[in-house]
Curated annotation (Swiss-Prot):
Mode of membrane association: Peripheral membrane protein
Keywords: ATP-binding, Cell membrane, Membrane, Nucleotide-binding, Translocase, Transport
Localization, UniProt: Cell membrane
Organism per entry: Pyrococcus abyssi (strain GE5 / Orsay)
Binding sites annotated in the UniProt record for ATP: 38-45
Record domain ABC transporter: where: 4-244
Pfam families: ABC_tran (PF00005)
Entry's EC annotation: 7.-.-.-
Enzyme class of the recorded protein, top EC level: translocase
One term under GO cellular component: ATP-binding cassette (ABC) transporter complex
Protein name (database record): Putative ABC transporter ATP-binding protein PYRAB03730
Function: Probably part of an ABC transporter complex. Responsible for energy coupling to the transport system.
Length: 280
């Protein structure tokens, strides 16, 4: 069952002559973990903004096509209504945090929606425990680490109980520890909470291991999609458009070029076995 359906979507920002998205068609299944990759300026972030209605409702430009989220056409429903179905997390957590305590940050959206107090507290406790920030609920958000800030931004979206979580390069400004904290949380949300994940991420090693499907953007278009092992087999094409190749695929590709293997996408066990054969 598709939870998101994108039909012939194109978009051009109001002050631009060029389209940021061109004829994008894409379906996302309920419960799927979808990874999105592409060079800078390829339309990835713009695509994310179409999924919760910020485009076309809040961002000026020319929008063509339709996006359906959980059966709702984003043209016909407000961003507030869509936010209970799609949560959006940006690169910089500071752009989403503006309250005095962690607790107030997570409560903010629920108060605006008029959620009953008992239900509000139940959701807040659930979300903060899930992202491992319950013990820091009285902290001033700017005092948190980068990884903690991003987890707080995720919690502030999770309390809305969205069926889909869209994360636009959530680890790009984090140190290695912060990246691991956030990506571990993303895995948990998909596997245990059954939330559909759409993750724009430069960490292709992570996507190769954990995504169900990869979509490649270039020039505002979807130029490739498939299972991770299928997509990353196209090493030369991905390198040509500026995609970082996962470590084990790089090794496998070198073996393939030397005629040692037929595939570039190999497990580390397969790589070790092939190298061992050559050393005998």
């Amino acid at each position: 069952m598709n939870i998101i359906e994108v039909e012939n979507v194109s978009f051009k920002y109001g002050n631009s002559k060029a389209y940021s998205l061109r004829d994008v068609n894409l379906n996302v299944k309920k419960g799927e973990f979808l990874g999105i990759i592409g060079p800078s300026g390829s339309g990835k972030s713009t695509f994310c903004l179409t999924l919760n209605g910020l485009i076309p409702h809040s961002i000026n430009g020319e929008f063509e096509g339709n996006v359906f989220v959980d059966g709702l056409n984003t043209r016909e429903h407000s961003v507030a209504e869509l936010s209970t179905r799609v949560g959006l997390v940006f690169q910089n957590p500071d752009s989403q945090l503006f309250n005095m305590t962690v607790l107030e940050e997570v409560a903010f959206a629920l108060e605006n929606l008029g959620v009953e107090r008992e239900e509000m507290w139940r959701r807040i406790r659930w979300a903060l425990k899930l992202v491992k920030l319950w013990d820091k609920r009285e902290e001033f958000p700017p005092n948190l680490s980068g990884g903690e800030k991003q987890r707080l931004a995720i919690a502030s979206v999770l309390v809305m109980k969205p069926k889909v979580l869209v994360l636009d390069e959530p680890t790009s400004q984090l140190d290695p520890l912060g990246r691991e904290e956030v990506l571990s949380l993303v895995r948990l949300l998909n596997k245990e909470e059954k939330i559909t994940i759409i993750l724009v991420e430069h960490n292709t090693d992570f996507l190769l291991e954990h995504a169900d499907r990869i979509v490649v953007f270039d020039g505002g278009r979807v130029v490739m999609e498939g299972k991770p092992e299928e997509v990353f087999e196209n090493v030369e094409f991905l390198e040509r458009i500026g995609i970082r190749i996962p470590t084990r695929v790089k090794i496998g590709y070198e073996l393939k070029k030397r005629g040692i293997t037929r595939r570039a996408v190999l497990s580390y066990e397969e790589i070790i076995a092939e190298i061992a054969k050559q050393l005998r």
